[in-house]
From Swiss-Prot:
Subunit structure, interactors included: Homodimer which binds Holliday junction (HJ) DNA. The HJ becomes 2-fold symmetrical on binding to RuvC with unstacked arms; it has a different conformation from HJ DNA in complex with RuvA. In the full resolvosome a probable DNA-RuvA(4)-RuvB(12)-RuvC(2) complex forms which resolves the HJ.
Name of the protein: Crossover junction endodeoxyribonuclease RuvC
Single GO molecular function: DNA binding
Organism, as annotated: Prosthecochloris aestuarii (strain DSM 271 / SK 413)
Cofactor annotation comment: Binds 2 Mg(2+) ion per subunit.
Source superkingdom: Bacteria
Residues the record lists as binding Mg(2+) 1: 7, 140
Subcellular location: Cytoplasm
SUPFAM superfamilies: Ribonuclease H-like
GO biological process annotation, one example: DNA repair
Length: 187
């Protein structure tokens, strides 16, 4: 199973491609899509869409794991993040991938056992699971790897350990169902 984990952002979007072979995790690829805040949000969204599309074409993941939106003090930042996430959801559906979403606290809990873990702890555990000695920077990349690992670990355990439920499909199926039933609205 190959999972593409994405830590979305309107200026920096981290990604991590992880392969799970039985109980062994391997790093396939990871990186950061760097954008300029001087670019229009529409241009940034197109770049993110195109670059993630190229990553999907190259590595052929079966699933995309995405960090859920969080409430930000700045409404404009939250709206931009929502637009980026919407483009990633549309890309995922257009490519026929499963979409799973995880809250930051859930990723931290699954990887470290503590929902309030810091970025250093998540980075350490992501490197531990992937057997990587050297640091991976920036944290957007290790967060994306953590999201992919969280998805694979939850899948191996039959669902999120905090919720005790089955797999965490996109927004309880909301976006996935909408995109499937309204393909003509997807660009």
């Amino acid at each position: 199973m190959i999972v593409l984990g994405v830590d979305p952002g309107s200026v920096h979007t981290g990604y991590g491609v992880v392969l799970c072979n039985g109980q062994k995790f391997s790093l396939v690829a990871c990186g950061l899509i760097r954008l300029s805040s001087n670019q229009s949000i529409a241009d940034r969204i197109k770049i993110i869409y195109d670059e993630l599309g190229a990553i999907i074409a190259e590595y052929n993941p079966q699933r995309l794991a995405l960090e859920t939106a969080y409430v930000n003090r700045n409404p404009q930042s939250a709206l931009k993040l929502g637009q980026v996430r919407g483009a990633i959801v549309a890309l995922t559906m257009n490519k026929g991938l499963e979409l799973h979403e995880y809250a930051p606290r859930e990723v931290k809990y699954v990887l470290t056992g503590k929902g309030s873990a810091g970025k250093e702890q998540v980075s350490y555990m992501a490197r531990h699971f992937l057997n990587i000695q050297e640091p991976i920077k920036p944290y957007d990349v290790t967060d994306a790897l953590g999201i992919a690992l969280c998805d694979l670990l939850c899948d191996a355990k039959g669902g999120s350990p905090r919720r005790g439920s089955g797999s965490r499909k996109s927004a309880r199926g909301g976006w996935e169902d909408f995109v499937r039933t309204n393909p003509e609205l997807i660009v």
